[in-house]
């Protein structure tokens, strides 16, 4: 009896403690989740708005190995062969790809990028700069940030045009989306535009962007390298018009495959757009392979770049088979012989 009393008391006390803890947890677990950053909080903040645009840049094409991770794109051509038979890049060599299984199917990616760009364009003017506008000692910073917002808006328009072109390049005429769409609406009856409509939209956007953006990205500092510029907009226009001039990108419903016409005026427009880029006088072929990758992004060939962290992936994927070497890309003799 003496031993049972403390045990029973202990059980009762533990039960009371558990009830107390559970009742206390109720309030704790029911707390409102207040760390979510909504649209209002994003686009009234200069810093958060800047990050939102950076997120749109993430949808630009990845680098040389964007298909198959380890494979350079040349492995899908006659220039090279990838050593790994199961690598996705091999689908292009074997013909084992179709509309349902396409290693380069980027429909979802680029429309996601277009949505982000549209949302940015619609909201960037909401950024609150009163902290600097109302401070006489911060007028220079106020003007800098005001200019940033204008520049960013046209960078987003460039990205939207770029993403549309990437879709047109792969799928032909696609719906041109210039506003943020509701997820609840029915878009099944959305008409497919003509190729000329798509090309006209992208080309026109490039012209408007080129009127605003400078030849140097952002404020001209190293951290801005990779942002859209006037040169990038004109170069995109040149590329778009070049594709548009090809008989392969005509509106096929009006022509048979055996009788595809060639529109000389479109070729002239493409040539003039390319000359407009050349006449900027800031781009040229780089003369030395030895120093091509050694100048910290200062390269006369770069028009639009996507920056990556310092690593040895390129070497690792292409070193001969050994410890730390994959031996992935094997060039053809034809490619070797094409060099002088």
How would you describe each model-predicted region?
Residues 2-12:
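Bacterial N-terminal signal peptides that target proteins for export
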Residues 12-20:
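Bacterial N-terminal signal peptides
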Residues 22-24:
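C-terminal motif of bacterial Sec signal peptides marking the signal peptidase cleavage site
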Residues 26-88, 174, 199, 227-340:
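An aromatic- and glycine-enriched ligand-binding surface/loop that stacks and positions planar moieties
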Residues 37-43, 99-107, 185-193, 224, ...:
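Second-shell loop/turn segments in exported
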Residues 50, 54-62, 84-171, 187-200, ...:
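Conserved, well-structured interaction surfaces
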Residues 127, 166, 170-173, 179, ...:
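Alpha-solenoid helical repeat scaffolds
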Residues 131-146, 173-192, 248-268:
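Short coil/linker segments at helix-helix boundaries
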């Amino acid at each position: 009896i003496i031993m049972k009393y403390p045990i029973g008391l202990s059980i009762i006390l533990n039960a009371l403690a558990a009830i107390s803890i559970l009742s206390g947890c109720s309030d704790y677990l029911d707390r409102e989740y207040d760390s979510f950053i909504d649209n209002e909080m994003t686009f009234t903040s200069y810093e958060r708005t800047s990050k939102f645009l950076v997120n749109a840049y993430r949808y630009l094409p990845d680098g040389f190995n964007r298909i198959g991770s380890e494979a350079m794109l040349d492995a899908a051509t006659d220039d090279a062969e990838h050593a790994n038979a199961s690598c996705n890049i091999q689908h292009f060599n074997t013909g084992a790809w179709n509309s349902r299984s396409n290693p380069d199917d980027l429909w979802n990616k680029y429309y996601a990028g277009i949505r982000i760009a549209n949302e940015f364009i619609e909201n960037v003017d909401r950024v609150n700069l009163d902290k600097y506008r109302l401070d006489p000692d911060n007028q220079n910073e106020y003007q800098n940030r005001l200019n940033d917002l204008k520049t960013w808006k046209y960078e987003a328009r460039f990205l939207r045009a770029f993403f549309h072109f990437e879709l047109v390049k792969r799928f032909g005429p696609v719906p041109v989306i210039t506003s943020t769409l509701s997820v609840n609406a029915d878009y099944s009856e959305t008409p497919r535009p003509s190729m000329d409509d798509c090309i006209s939209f992208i080309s026109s956007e490039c012209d408007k962007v080129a009127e605003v953006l400078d030849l140097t990205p952002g404020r001209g500092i190293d951290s801005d390298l990779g942002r859209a510029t006037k040169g990038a907009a004109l170069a995109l226009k040149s590329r778009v018009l070049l594709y548009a001039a090809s008989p392969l990108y005509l509106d096929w419903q009006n022509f048979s495959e055996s009788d595809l016409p060639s529109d000389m005026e479109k070729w002239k427009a493409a040539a003039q757009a390319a000359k407009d880029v050349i006449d900027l006088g800031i781009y040229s072929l780089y003369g030395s392979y030895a120093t091509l990758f050694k100048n910290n992004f200062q390269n006369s060939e770069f028009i639009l770049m996507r920056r990556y962290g310092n690593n040895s992936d390129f070497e690792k994927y292409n070193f001969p088979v050994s410890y730390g070497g994959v031996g992935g890309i094997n060039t053809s003799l034809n490619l070797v012989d094409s060099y002088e």
